[in-house]
Amino acid sequence: MDDIREHYQISHPESDPAVEVSAPITYTTLRAVHLDQVHDLLERSFWSGINVADSLDYSPERCTVVALYKKLVIGVAILSSPRETYITYLAVRCGWDNSQIATWMLYHLIKLNPGKDITLHVSANNPAMLLYNRFGFKAEEFITGFYEAYLDPQSPASKNAIRLRLRQL
């Protein structure tokens, strides 16, 4: 980003340099105001047509975590419901990958649902597998073609999935 600003300043010496104000990353519950950005992030991360508006109806304070930088949604994690505790989506905006956002969102979901097993499916070649392993998730099943109906045939992502479970007794 610094190189873009420097290029702009060289190209436009008459303009005053912009003052950048940094802000903390905040974590909050999913709200209707976030939905457009969340849907865009999930489409970029997974596939088109994802709609998580119904997550607002199922205890969003226990089942959703949204990471914000100022008003920009930079991450989202969603459980299907407090009873089922299945992670349907966990995504971080491109460029924010090494900011520990996924780690914090996963940590929050686990803490919001104590004593409940948490399950998820992850693409067999997804690097998020390392994150889940660090939290203690264990592989239960390998499912061939799990993502076949969702992924573009040209996608480098594996169409096979591994079902993982975090046991919390």
What are these regions (language model features)?
Residues 1, 35, 84, 103, ...:
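Generic preference for well-ordered alpha-helical elements
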Residues 1-32:
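Conserved N-terminal entry element of GNAT/NAT acetyltransferase domains
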Residues 3-6, 119-121, 138-159, 163:
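Conserved catalytic-core motifs of GNAT/GCN5-like acyltransferases
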Residues 29-32, 41-51:
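Helix-loop element at the rim of GNAT/NAT acetyltransferase active sites that forms part
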Residues 46-95:
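A conserved beta-strand-loop-helix scaffold within acyl/acetyltransferase catalytic domains
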Residues 93-95, 99, 124:
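Active-site acidic-Proline motif in GNAT/NAT acetyltransferases
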Residues 98-111, 130-134:
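Conserved acetyl-CoA-binding loop-helix of GNAT-fold acetyltransferases
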Residues 111-124, 131, 143:
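Conserved GNAT acetyl-CoA-binding A-motif
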